[in-house]
């Protein structure tokens, strides 16, 4: 039986790493050892940033909602409290999209939230 020298396997692994490192700058794109490190670091960043993206979008939706409800004389926290008391269960993404694309419908939601709040809280805003 012939001896297996694993040249094909090594070549395939190297090719896979270099393909992933395509577009990198300097030796990171064509030196196996450095490219492998760069690709691994890139994957770490990708994993971390998939988590961060969720946080960033939630923060963006909250900022948009805060700006939109302030036009109606409320703050974000009072608005969310009013929604909870009114029994309206809509996520922040949907509310944010509603505020941007359907201002009339969003106004109706804000009015329902205002109505569910105690009178002095709605006046204080």
Curated annotation (Swiss-Prot):
Cross-referenced Pfam families: Ribosomal_L20
SUPFAM superfamilies the UniProt entry points to: Ribosomal protein L20
InterPro entries the UniProt entry points to: Ribosomal_bL20, RIBOSOMAL_L20_CS, Ribosomal_protein_bL20_C
Segments forming a coiled coil: none
GO MF, one annotated term: rRNA binding
GO (cellular component) term, any one: ribosome
GO biological process, one term: ribosomal large subunit assembly
Keywords: Ribonucleoprotein, Ribosomal protein, RNA-binding, rRNA-binding
The protein's role, per its UniProt record: Binds directly to 23S ribosomal RNA and is necessary for the in vitro assembly process of the 50S ribosomal subunit. It is not involved in the protein synthesizing functions of that subunit.
Protein family membership: Belongs to the bacterial ribosomal protein bL20 family.
Protein name: Large ribosomal subunit protein bL20
Naturally occurring in which organism (per UniProt): Methylobacterium nodulans (strain LMG 21967 / CNCM I-2342 / ORS 2060)
């Amino acid at each position: 039986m012939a001896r297996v020298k694993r040249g094909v396997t090594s070549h395939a692994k190297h090719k896979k790493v270099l393909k992933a490192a395509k577009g990198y700058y300097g030796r990171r794109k064509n030196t196996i050892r450095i490219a492998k490190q760069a690709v691994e670091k890139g994957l770490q960043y990708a994993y971390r940033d998939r988590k961060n993206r969720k946080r960033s979008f939630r923060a963006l939706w909250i900022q948009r909602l805060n700006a939109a409800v302030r036009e109606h004389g409320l703050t974000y926290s009072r608005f969310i409290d009013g929604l909870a008391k009114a029994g309206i269960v809509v996520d922040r993404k949907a509310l944010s999209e509603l505020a941007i694309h359907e201002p009339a419908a969003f106004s109706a939601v804000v009015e329902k939230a205002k109505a569910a709040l105690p009178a002095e809280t709605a006046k204080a805003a």
